[in-house]
């Protein structure tokens, strides 16, 4: 595989898996929601969100999402600017997906949306799950701020078309 990397055919990445630590979540908890509206997002609104990590990439229909999953969004001027959603659910585990509009990144809004989804998980006795690419520094840092601890690092290769 190294020849493919050297020739620029394959791109090496690493996937990180995290485990949730509720004590760390509350230790770092700083969700000042007073200045933002955070809503439970209707499933039909979710399928209009654009970006690289969006619900329509994980769920076949809004109805399927509504029957299994949950999402919360930070709203500004009536629009969802950061949305945390169920990207997968199995038994008592709920994997979190997050998408923040590029104009609103770096403002702590993803933290607020994810914290709300984590609170929902805890109320429903679900274990929040997080995974991302090592190269996605924003996601790695957000996971740690939310109380997740890295448990597994898996290298893989991507071969663009």
Each model region followed by its residue ranges:
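Conserved catalytic-core motifs of GNAT/GCN5-like acyltransferases
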Residues: 10-20, 149-161
């Amino acid at each position: 595989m190294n020849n493919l990397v050297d020739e620029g055919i394959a791109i090496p990445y690493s996937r990180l898996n995290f485990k949730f630590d509720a004590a760390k979540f509350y230790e770092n908890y700083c969700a000042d929601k007073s200045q933002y509206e955070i809503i439970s997002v209707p499933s039909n609104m979710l399928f209009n969100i654009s970006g690289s990590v969006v619900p329509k990439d994980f769920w076949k229909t809004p109805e399927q999402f509504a029957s299994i999953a949950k999402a919360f969004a930070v709203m500004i001027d009536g629009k969802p600017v950061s949305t945390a959603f169920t990207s997968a659910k199995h038994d008592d585990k709920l994997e979190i997906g997050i998408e923040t509009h590029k104009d609103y990144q770096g403002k702590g809004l993803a933290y607020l949306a994810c914290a709300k989804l984590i609170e929902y998980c805890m109320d429903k006795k679900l274990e929040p799950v997080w995974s991302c690419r090592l190269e996605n520094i924003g996601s790695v840092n957000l996971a740690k701020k939310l109380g997740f601890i890295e448990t597994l690092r898996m290298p893989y290769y991507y071969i663009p078309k």
